[in-house]
């Protein structure tokens, strides 16, 4: 596997820490040892997160093309767009963000606080669009890029989650290589890696990276899209492309992509009772915060799988904490009593 042939622009602090979740593990019976890899602490750029790791491989391409404006898209409370805005500010570039109405959540401050507030503070041109949720290429995003061209700028396209970008899977191939180096220091290997999946390139990169040592199907995606067929297909397609460009040496098969679809409801961006219980449990036992859109759902999935005995006794499970905490203030009404 040859990740090193791709240029990388450093936006993160370095390898993210692996933290044992001792109290949560004990609360769940102690037979499975839970750990978290803290991608939510990976950068000093506006809280960082998993997209910042991905952007390290997109930014060299943007600079090589002479782009002056990063153009990205997401929902109103998109973590992706906040991270793109931060990187643009850091590099002295312009930033246009398309924020679509992906979540059916009615709150008068939803589009004024959290991620979107931070993006505005960092100088991004934020454009609210009424279109609903979809993980594919969006008309509104293409129109935003054309508007930059018409104004004499040179846009660089960064799709939702970086996922439809040809280099979007590379960052989390690097994540797998980083985990292997940390495992050598820890003296053990993780039996499973749990990760939230929506647009797909985070899990896709992990699948390719862990395929290098035979653990592709030990990456357990927890769907948060509530459109699992689309998400599974997109993970598989991105993983196959990424495997080719990093010269993995084997094809990614359907069985390499594991996506648990039980925890996404009621729909994208809205938590269920299990999501909320997982958020509160992790916060109160570990002081680790997760959000109701992504990490609360993957935390719910991991906790439930432990309770159901779906991880063998003695297993060591690594939870990939991808970020998302800045969105919590947009859901303040849900958590008004903690």
From Swiss-Prot:
Iron-sulfur: present as a keyword of the record? no
CDD domains referenced in this protein's UniProt entry, alphabetically: ACCD (cd06449)
Q: Which residues form the signal peptide?
A: none
Q: Which residues form the active site?
A: 78 (nucleophile)
Q: What is its EC number?
A: 3.5.99.7
Q: Which cofactor does it need?
A: pyridoxal 5'-phosphate
In its UniProt record, which GO terms are filed under biological process?
A: 1-aminocyclopropane-1-carboxylate metabolic process; amine catabolic process
Q: Which reaction does it catalyse?
A: 1-aminocyclopropane-1-carboxylate + H2O = 2-oxobutanoate + NH4(+)
Name the keywords, alphabetized. Answer: Hydrolase, Pyridoxal phosphate
* InterPro entries hit by this protein: ACCD_DCysDesulf, ACP_carboxylate_deaminase, ACP_carboxylate_deaminase_bac, TrpB-like_PALP, TrpB-like_PALP_sf
- Looking at the Swiss-Prot or TrEMBL record, what is one Pfam family this protein matches? PALP
Which GO molecular function, any one, fits this protein according to its record? pyridoxal phosphate binding
Per its UniProt record, what Gene3D superfamilies does this chain match?
A: 3.40.50.1100
**What HAMAP family does this protein's entry cite?**
ACC_deaminase
- PANTHER family under this entry? 1-AMINOCYCLOPROPANE-1-CARBOXYLATE DEAMINASE-RELATED (PTHR43780:SF2)
Function text:
Catalyzes a cyclopropane ring-opening reaction, the irreversible conversion of 1-aminocyclopropane-1-carboxylate (ACC) to ammonia and alpha-ketobutyrate. Allows growth on ACC as a nitrogen source.
Into which family does the record put it?
Belongs to the ACC deaminase/D-cysteine desulfhydrase family.
Q: How does it assemble?
A: Homotrimer.
Name listed for the protein in its UniProt record: 1-aminocyclopropane-1-carboxylate deaminase
């Amino acid at each position: 596997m040859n990740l090193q042939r791709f240029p990388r622009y450093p936006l993160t602090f370095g390898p993210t820490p692996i933290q044992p979740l001792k109290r949560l593990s004990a609360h769940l019976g102690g037979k499975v040892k839970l750990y978290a890899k803290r991608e939510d602490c990976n950068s000093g750029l506006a809280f960082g997160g998993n997209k910042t790791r991905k952007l390290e491989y997109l930014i060299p391409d943007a600079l090589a093309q002479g782009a002056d404006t990063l153009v990205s898209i997401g929902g109103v409370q998109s973590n992706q767009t906040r991270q793109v805005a931060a990187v643009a500010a850091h590099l002295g570039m312009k930033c246009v963000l398309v924020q679509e109405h992906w979540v059916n959540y009615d709150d008068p401050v939803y589009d004024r606080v959290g991620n979107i507030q931070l993006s505005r503070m960092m100088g991004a041109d934020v454009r609210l669009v009424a279109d609903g949720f979809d993980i594919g290429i969006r008309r509104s995003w293409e129109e935003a890029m054309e508007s930059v061209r018409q104004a004499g700028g040179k846009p660089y396209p960064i799709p939702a989650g970086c996922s439809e970008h040809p280099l979007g899977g590379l960052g989390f191939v690097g994540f797998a290589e980083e985990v292997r180096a940390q495992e050598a220091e820890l003296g053990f290997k993780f039996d499973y890696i749990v990760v939230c999946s929506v647009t797909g390139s985070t899990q896709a990169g992990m699948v390719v990276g862990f395929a290098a040592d035979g653990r592709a199907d030990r990456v357990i995606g927890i769907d948060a899209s509530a459109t699992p067929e689309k998400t599974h297909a997109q993970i598989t397609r991105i993983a196959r492309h990424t495997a080719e460009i990093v010269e993995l040496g084997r094809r990614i098969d359907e069985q390499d992509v594991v996506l648990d679809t039980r925890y996404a409801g009621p729909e994208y961006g809205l938590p269920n009772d299990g999501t909320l219980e997982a958020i509160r449990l992790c916060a109160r036992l570990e002081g680790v915060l997760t959000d109701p859109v992504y990490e609360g759902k993957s935390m719910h999935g991991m906790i439930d799988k432990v309770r159901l005995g779906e991880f063998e006794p003695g297993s060591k499970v690594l939870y990939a904490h991808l970020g998302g905490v800045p969105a919590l203030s947009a859901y303040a009404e849900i958590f008004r009593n903690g």
